[in-house]
């Protein structure tokens, strides 16, 4: 990605008093960005987990990976980065990044490091400080910022690129906002549709599964309290603490006889059949996963074999 250089769009110097922010004025983006929903879900999950661990909202930092063809950039995935704060300045752990880079290149060979992300509001000088560190890894990285605390209905995501502007006679790094589009694959559409369906009818606090489990829990809790009340009455009547009520005892006896007998041969046969079905489903899942692993291994072996064969043929041309 070529670095963009501008001087307020017209070669004029920028007055710091007029533009105290880190945003460049009158600069158009040099690239087009396609953002996948998986990236937004990853960032949101990262922020929620850290907030749950720390007990308060915290800023999170991570890396963006994807593909680039000329001026077209497709941000497809992301992973978390380690950082520490020294004298109120964030420092990225580059050794951790290089380790993660080796790992994701083994899985996503066709993807490359495109930039970084963080959470918060409007970009500030601390973001520029981190962006300069990322610039030491790749040239002109993207910068994505998600605001998880916003109350607006629009997608709270902004994408930026760095530009060099003249501020008070000095070359200064500023940020220029980029427009982006959402790009989805089939698996992402299914996942996003599932998340949307879970919260479409409610306030967003409970999913459909959670509401179903809460209803079942309430029913079982009520049943348990009623059974315990009957049991306490029978024990008290047997101990002579309360008078016998034959009508209540007959209803309790009839209720007990309504329960299925769990020691019959038919129950055992049905129980074993169900256990076998569950075990078979588990085995089928394991076999499917093993077949997928074997398929990936064969594909990699064939690629390696083809490369070695091409190398031998190329060497044969010179001997």
From Swiss-Prot:
InterPro entries: EIF3F/CSN6-like_C, JAMM/MPN+_dom, MPN, MPN_CSN6
Keyword Nucleus: yes
GO biological process: protein deneddylation
Domain MPN intervals: 33-166
Cysteine-cysteine disulfides: none
Organism superkingdom: Eukaryota
Subunit structure: Component of the CSN complex, probably composed of cops1, cops2, cops3, cops4, cops5, cops6, cops7, cops8 and cops9.
PANTHER family: COP9 SIGNALOSOME COMPLEX SUBUNIT 6, EUKARYOTIC TRANSLATION INITIATION FACTOR 3 SUBUNIT F-RELATED
Name of the protein: COP9 signalosome complex subunit 6
Organism: Xenopus tropicalis (Western clawed frog)
Classification lineage: Eukaryota, Metazoa, Chordata, Craniata, Vertebrata
């Amino acid at each position: 990605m070529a670095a963009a250089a501008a001087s307020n769009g017209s070669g004029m110097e920028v007055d710091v008093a007029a533009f105290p922010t880190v945003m460049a004025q009158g600069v158009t983006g040099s690239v087009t960005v396609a953002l996948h929903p998986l990236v937004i879900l990853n960032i949101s999950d990262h922020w929620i987990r850290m907030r749950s661990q720390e007990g308060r909202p915290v800023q999170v930092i991570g890396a963006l990976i994807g593909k680039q063809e000329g001026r077209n950039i497709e941000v497809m995935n992301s992973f978390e980065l380690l950082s520490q704060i020294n004298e109120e300045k964030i420092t990225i752990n580059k050794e951790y990044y290089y380790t993660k880079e080796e790992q994701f290149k083994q899985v996503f060979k066709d993807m490359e490091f495109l930039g970084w992300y963080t959470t918060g509001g409007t970009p500030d000088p601390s973001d520029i400080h981190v962006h300069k560190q990322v610039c030491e890894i790749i040239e002109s990285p993207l910068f994505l910022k998600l605001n998880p605390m916003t109350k607006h209905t629009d997608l709270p995501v902004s994408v930026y690129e760095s530009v060099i502007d003249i501020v008070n006679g000095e070359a200064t790094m500023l940020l220029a906002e980029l427009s982006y589009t959402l790009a989805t694959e089939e698996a992402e559409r299914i996942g996003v549709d599932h998340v949307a369906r879970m919260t479409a009818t409610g306030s967003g606090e409970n999913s459909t599964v959670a509401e179903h489990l809460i209803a079942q829990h309430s029913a079982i809790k009520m049943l348990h309290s009623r059974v315990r009340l009957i049991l306490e009455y029978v024990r008290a009547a047997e101990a002579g603490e309360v008078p016998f009520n034959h009508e209540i005892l007959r209803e309790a006896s009839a209720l007990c006889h309504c329960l299925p007998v769990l020691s019959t041969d038919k129950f055992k046969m049905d129980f074993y059949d169900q256990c076998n079905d569950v075990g078979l489903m588990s085995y089928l899942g394991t076999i499917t996963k093993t077949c997928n692993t074997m398929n990936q291994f064969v594909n990699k072996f064939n690629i390696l074999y083809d490369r070695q064969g091409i190398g031998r043929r190329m060497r044969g041309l010179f001997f």
